[in-house]
A protein has these predicted regions:
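Active-site flanking residues adjacent to catalytic metal/cofactor-binding acidic residues
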Residues: 38
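Short, surface-exposed ligand- or partner-binding patches at beta-edge/loop junctions that are enriched
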Residues: 80
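Rhodanese-like catalytic fold shared by cysteine-dependent sulfurtransferases
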Residues: 2-10, 16-35, 43-75, 85-123
Length: 123
């Protein structure tokens, strides 16, 4: 019985830990409803290629919350990174700060380009 209880508790912990993650989509998106495209990777990653017109807002930058303060919290934003993880983290921070517009997780650069129809700008 103890082993069963440990499995149940571990499963519940995993479910609650993953519940805050924001999934990214592979379905095409109507970009007309988004105010801005935000790349939350590092400047070095951004320099290797980014969506045309994307604004760099490094989620790992200590000033990330201050950068978010320059945005309209009621607007819709399309957010992407390298894998979808950091864009999900950025979205969670934005929600915690009171952002009420649609916050779309574009996932990785290639997926974000595919679903948005925006070209990747290469160096």
């Amino acid at each position: 019985m103890t082993k069963f209880l440990k499995i149940v508790v571990a499963s519940l912990v995993a479910v609650f830990a993953l519940s805050g993650l924001t999934a990214c989509s592979s379905e095409p998106v109507d970009m007309a409803s988004y105010t801005a495209v935000i790349d939350v990777r590092t400047p070095e990653e951004y320099a290797t290629g980014h969506l045309d017109g994307a604004v760099l807002m490094n989620v790992q930058d200590p000033n990330f919350v201050e950068m978010l303060g320059t945005l309209d919290p009621t607007a819709n934003y399309f957010i992407y990174c390298r894998s979808g993880n950091r864009s999900g983290q950025a979205i969670e921070q934005m929600k915690a700060l009171g952002f009420t517009g649609e916050l779309f997780n574009g996932g990785a650069v290639a997926n974000a380009s595919s679903v948005s129809g925006i070209q990747v700008v290469l160096p």
